[in-house]
Amino acid sequence: MFTFFKINKIAAQLITLCVACLWFSTINAQNNTPKFKVIAFYTGRDDKAHISFMHEANKWFPKMAAKYNFTYDSTKNWNNLNAEFLSHYKVVIFLDTRIDDPAQRLAFQKYMENGGGWIGFHFSAFALTPSDFPQNWDWYHNEFLGSGSYVSNTWHPTSAILRVEDHNFPATKHLPETFKSAPNEWYRWSNDLRKNPDIKILVSIDSTSFPLGTGPKQSEIWHSGYYPVVWTNKKYKMMYMNMGHNDIDYDNKTYKDLSHTLENEYEEKMIIDALLWMGRGSK
């Protein structure tokens, strides 16, 4: 009798152990399942500084995906920018340019209006008429981004002291009041974003940065003014960052990288917090 009960007790313990192992395996599998998917579009041509950033980003984002448990894909095939393809992704990234095809533009607009997430870097907001990138997309440049057309930029790429203007936004709530950026070519825009009620300016260039730029043209050195560099549109789940232009040795024609955008801890933190906010929320 004693042996019978002892065997039953051991069997019960084994069953309990198996159930516990199965439960922990299920939980572990759930935890290892990527929480959301990110797709980055890029062109990878023309400006060596933009190409440098594109390569840097396509090495950095997969590392962050493994660390923060999301999936990162990238493509230079802009034909993928359609409703069916985008339906598999929570966040879209434009690394170095924008869309030109009307059908793709409409697909992106609907994706954003339906709650998709977007992060755009540097040249993705560029528009100048006349140029190869004219301002011929009013929804994107005037409503969505709010910035209008490109007006001018600093040169050479230099670091700036940046001021965080809103600590309530998910991407900036963990940032200090001010921080030093990675070197960048900074843009000025035709529209005053402060006058747009839909735009929330998140980060701007602090006045302690002036003079900003080294020239040689005087117009490439900023001595005063107000320059937003990161903002969001409150109607959409989006964030634009003017960063994304690495410093390249053009002067000596070696074309070597002299700086990298994603070696700045504060800019990295801002990007990751934005991705996690966009990716983990409901679409």
Named regions from a protein language model:
Residues 98-174:
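A glycine-rich, often tryptophan-bearing local segment used as a flexible ligand/cofactor-contacting loop or short
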Residues 54-58, 137, 155-157, 164-168, ...:
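A structural signal for well-ordered alpha-helical scaffolds and beta->alpha junctions
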Residues 1-33:
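Bacterial Sec-dependent N-terminal signal peptides
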Residues 35-128:
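Helical hinge/lid and interdomain linker segments adjacent to catalytic or ligand-binding clefts
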Residues 45-46, 80, 99, 125-127, ...:
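Short, solvent-exposed loop/turn segments at secondary-structure junctions
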